[in-house]
Amino acid sequence: KEIVLIMFDLYFAGARNKFADAYLLKCGANRLQSQLLDRRNISEWVLKKSDNSKLFIDSGAYSAYTKGVSISVDDYIMYLNSITSKCTIFAQLDTIPGQMGKVKTKEDRLNAPRLSWENFLYMYDRLKEPEKLVPIFHQGEDYDWLWNMLEWRNNKEEPLSYIGISPAVDVPGLEEFLTKSFDKLLVIRHCFEYSIFI
């Protein structure tokens, strides 16, 4: 009987408790932090983290969506370029469909993945280390967008190293979405805001 070991990195998210933060820093834990909410904490982490701990920067797109604020993609790119040598990976600035608290239209749902992909391409061309950029595929989006990510090649004909999978944990079909998405991916993937095993 063959045993297959699947290795993964666990990233601890959030920066609301200074004691937990200090402990994670001391332990050399991997961190996922939002550039929208955690820049001060990221600055401290960049200065003090061990060489073997990993830092994943999230755009904060969902937090911006819930607060009704926008994020400048150019500001985000400039910020990432300023700390890129200390980061392992960073999430693209993705587009969440519609507005918080309002019913999402069909047009909202169709436009969001297209706008996200356009942001990915825009960012990729402007980052110092674009190979660290993670495009995000959201539950509810047409799987053509995931296949697009899998087929995409940069100007050196290299495929993506990472793809982010973003489940909607509050809707039916989560297990089917994760199974279908993960079965097709032969790249490193990150499952956003999801930390239970199925």
Question: Where do the PLM segments sit?
Answer:
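Non-catalytic, usually N-terminal nucleic-acid engagement modules in DNA/RNA processing proteins
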Residues: 1-126
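A structural motif corresponding to the C-terminal end of an alpha-helix
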Residues: 79-89, 119-133, 156-159, 184-194
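Glycine-rich phosphate/ribose-binding loops and adjacent secondary-structure elements
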Residues: 133-198
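Short beta-strand/loop segments at the ligand-binding rim of alpha/beta enzyme cores
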Residues: 6-10, 52-57, 128-134, 186-198
